[in-house]
């Protein structure tokens, strides 16, 4: 099954997450099909906290991709 979930990046104590479209059998930070956005939980000031390519996200959802609970909440917050 194709899922849209977060993949952790960044460095120690400074997390940064990519919103990835991936096969659910792949590792969390492993192979992915497409990157559709990012989430920066440590953003301050004018830094961008979240960016989502809504057009591509909708494309994958229409084709049956399932969003994780956290991604669903982030997409609602960014809208």
From Swiss-Prot:
Gene3D superfamilies, alphabetized: 3.30.1320.10
Keywords attached to this Swiss-Prot or TrEMBL record, sorted alphabetically, are: Ribonucleoprotein, Ribosomal protein
Q: Name one GO molecular function term.
A: structural constituent of ribosome
A GO BP term, please?
translation
Q: Which GO terms describe its cellular component?
A: cytoplasm; small ribosomal subunit
InterPro entries linked to this entry: Ribosomal_bS16, Ribosomal_bS16_dom_sf
Q: Which domain of life is it from?
A: Bacteria
HAMAP family linked: Ribosomal_bS16
Q: Which family, according to UniProt?
A: Belongs to the bacterial ribosomal protein bS16 family.
Q: What is this protein called?
A: Small ribosomal subunit protein bS16
Q: Which gene encodes it?
A: rpsP
